[in-house]
Amino acid sequence: MSLHSKSESLYAQAKQVIPGGVNSPVRAFNGVGGVPLFIERADGAYLFDVDGKAYIDYVGSWGPMVLGHNHPAIRNAVIEAAQRGLSFGAPTEMEVKMAELVTELVPTMDMVRMVNSGTEATMSAIRLARGYTNRDKIIKFEGCYHGHADCLLVKAGSGALTLGQPNSPGVPADFAKHTLTCTFNDLDSVRTAFEQYPSEIACIIVEPVAGNMNCVPPLPEFLPGLRALCDKYGALLIIDEVMTGFRVALAGAQSYYDVVPDLTCLGKIIGGGMPVGAFGGRREVMAALAPTGPVYQAGTLSGNPIAMAAGFACLTEVSQVGVHQTLTELTDMLAAGLLHAAKEENVALVVNHVGGMFGLFFTDALSVTSYQDVMQCDVERFKRFFHLMLEEGVYLAPSAFEAGFMSIAHSKEDIQRTIDAARRCFAKL
């Protein structure tokens, strides 16, 4: 009998009523093969599937669970808020408190607008940048993903990479023509775009750490160079911190790498596990947003009281002294241990990591710093490694193009168990 018989049954059932059996493509395990695990519950650093098996979790709901699963402060905040009502469609005090906390923690954000997802945040920020500058074109980077808005699904990164589709059908060429795709970590490609369209580019949008082609940090000159080019040509710099915000550092990767954006997009951790996104930045730019300005954006559930309570509780905990030091130390321990184990078993491996993010690349290269480097990695070897680790009770992202995430709920014993499991798996590759 299969070890995952209930997951297999549920997956077959789901495929009859949900496209592909999942509500987000990467969950289908298309990137690694096999049947996706159906999860019954989660606690701390662990997931528990419907067949009763426990896994050390390095997906963390794709980033939000920086405190670990089912954190009592967040759980209690949600229960308390739910007792007062689920949605009002009107302003609340918690929205104000949440906005004040976000702008306090991320100093480049003078003002912030709450939305319901990272996609909404990036889509709205780009509309705002276009409206503020009165320009149409945007620059994004090959292999970077900023949600599934039409103008951004151009050489988009993980979602598309996992499925082997660099572009999505259904995106008209007329939409995509205003999206200029440059090479991550290559300032020359950005200079060329600005030289070709010096007065037409509204903004650059960038993941400060590219977490949707696994985990690729910026080269030292890259983010400052983008800031300088935006200043030179009158474009806005949008830093997409949906993944890195409150994880790489308390004030995000922009703080870690010392770069000042005009607009910042947030998601994942900001909701503590609830569906929350946000975008914000310079006061004069945000003033162009409705109802004070002409750029329209709205949402029935934006600022939802349950989501705001969860987010406020999460950010309050994340901002405690020592959280990010612990997160970094645990990630460093995992990265060093995996590299050592791989070396012992003669497996060529590169591990990129920053803050509470990490990426594993099966490659003979000495480093991975670009989309081209990522595409040279051994995806088939990753697939085998993923399933071997799953059998060992370790849940990694089911795609060679997705970052891994640490939480402060992971213990050093969890990390050591993971390293020991990886050593056994490396020996079988």
From Swiss-Prot:
State which pathway it belongs to.
Porphyrin-containing compound metabolism; protoporphyrin-IX biosynthesis; 5-aminolevulinate from L-glutamyl-tRNA(Glu): step 2/2
Q: This protein is called what?
A: Glutamate-1-semialdehyde 2,1-aminomutase
Q: Output the GO biological process annotations, alphabetical, semicolon-separated.
A: protoporphyrinogen IX biosynthetic process
One GO CC term, this protein: cytoplasm
**Similarity comment text for this entry:** Belongs to the class-III pyridoxal-phosphate-dependent aminotransferase family. HemL subfamily.
Record keywords, A-Z: Cytoplasm, Isomerase, Porphyrin biosynthesis, Pyridoxal phosphate
* Subunit details: Homodimer.
Q: Which EC number(s) does the record attach to this protein?
A: 5.4.3.8
Reactions catalysed, semicolon-separated, are: (S)-4-amino-5-oxopentanoate = 5-aminolevulinate
Cofactor(s) required for function per UniProt:
pyridoxal 5'-phosphate
MF terms from GO for this chain are: glutamate-1-semialdehyde 2,1-aminomutase activity; pyridoxal phosphate binding; transaminase activity
Under the heading NCBIfam families, the entry gives: hemL (TIGR00713), PRK00062.1 (NF000818)
> Modified residue N6-(pyridoxal phosphate)lysine is at which positions?
268
InterPro entries, per this entry? 4pyrrol_synth_GluAld_NH2Trfase, Aminotrans_3, Aminotrans_3_PPA_site, PyrdxlP-dep_Trfase, PyrdxlP-dep_Trfase_major, PyrdxlP-dep_Trfase_small
Give the organism the record lists: Serratia proteamaculans (strain 568)
Record flagged with keyword DNA damage: no
Q: Which Pfam families match?
A: Aminotran_3 (PF00202)
Q: Which PANTHER family match?
A: GLUTAMATE-1-SEMIALDEHYDE 2,1-AMINOMUTASE (PTHR43713), GLUTAMATE-1-SEMIALDEHYDE 2,1-AMINOMUTASE 1, CHLOROPLASTIC-RELATED (PTHR43713:SF3)
The subcellular location is:
Cytoplasm
Q: What class of enzyme is it?
A: isomerase
Q: Which cysteines are joined by disulfide bonds?
A: none
